[in-house]
Swiss-Prot record:
Effect of residue 33 to A: A 3-fold decrease in binding of the 5S rRNA
Keyword Disulfide bond belongs to the record: no
Record's subunit section: Contacts the P site tRNA. Forms a bridge to the 30S subunit in the 70S ribosome. Part of the 50S ribosomal subunit. Part of the 5S rRNA/L5/L18 subcomplex; in this organism only 2 proteins, L5 and L18 have been shown to be part of the 5S rRNA subcomplex, unlike E.coli and T.thermophilus where L25 (TL5) is also found. Has been shown to bind 5S rRNA.
Family to which the UniProt record says this protein belongs: Belongs to the universal ribosomal protein uL5 family.
NCBIfam families: PRK00010.1 (NF000585)
Gene Ontology cellular component terms for the protein in this record: ribonucleoprotein complex; ribosome
Entry GO MF terms: rRNA binding; structural constituent of ribosome; tRNA binding
Protein name per UniProt: Large ribosomal subunit protein uL5
PROSITE patterns referenced in this protein's UniProt entry, alphabetically: RIBOSOMAL_L5
Effect of residue 77 to A: An 8-fold decrease in binding of the 5S rRNA
Gene transcribed to yield this protein: rplE
Signal peptide bounds: none
The entry's keywords: Ribonucleoprotein, Ribosomal protein, RNA-binding, rRNA-binding, tRNA-binding
GO biological process, one term: translation
Length: 179
């Protein structure tokens, strides 16, 4: 069993049970999935940019991403409906815990001037969104092979009903929130 999953079962669940007075163990919020999304706007002019983004996401997530396409045409961006414009990957189960563990313990501390992640990035339904400015914070990415620094969005979807419960869940799992 994954290190983070073990921590969740042994420490986080009992702590949340006592803090929020849940009657059943099934009420305790858990992480449902993690979605990593990388928008590649320059794929319109340069289709090869998308291939490198897909490759990088595959290395980061450990599974192949889905290429996302434009929903509608925008003339100002020279964009046609259905053009490939980004990549996303949805992680569940073991891979999700492995990725979260790696994100918390290895990648986030590698961010320059890192002071913790924002406490305000919850959406009101218990989901947390985290923006990353560069893909170089992940140890799998080789600095010399990167042709362009790209950011990504990481959405952590939980079963929590309120932001407070989700914040407590992530904090107990080791998410470095700002003081």
């Amino acid at each position: 069993m994954n290190r983070l999953k073990e921590k969740y079962v042994k420490e986080v669940v009992p702590a949340l049970m006592s803090k929020f007075n849940y009657k059943s163990i099934m009420q305790v919020p858990k992480i449902e999935k993690i979605v990593i999304n990388m928008g590649v706007g320059d794929a319109v002019q340069n289709p090869k940019a998308l291939d490198s983004a897909v490759e990088e996401l595959t290395l980061i997530a450990g599974q192949r991403p889905v290429v996302t396409r434009a929903k509608k045409s925008i003339a100002g961006f020279r964009l046609r409906q259905g053009m490939p414009i980004g990549a996303k990957v949805t992680l569940r189960g073991e891979r999700m815990y492995e990725f979260l563990d790696k994100l918390i313990s290895v990648s986030l501390p590698r961010v320059r001037d890192f002071r913790g992640v924002s406490k305000k990035a919850f959406d009101g339904r218990g989901n947390y969104t985290l923006g990353i400015k560069e893909q170089l914070i992940f140890p799998e990415i080789d600095y010399d092979k990167v042709n362009k620094v790209r950011g990504m969005d990481i959405v952590i979807v939980t079963t929590a009903n309120t932001d407070e419960e989700a914040r407590e869940l992530l904090a107990l799992l080791g998410m470095p929130f700002q003081k």
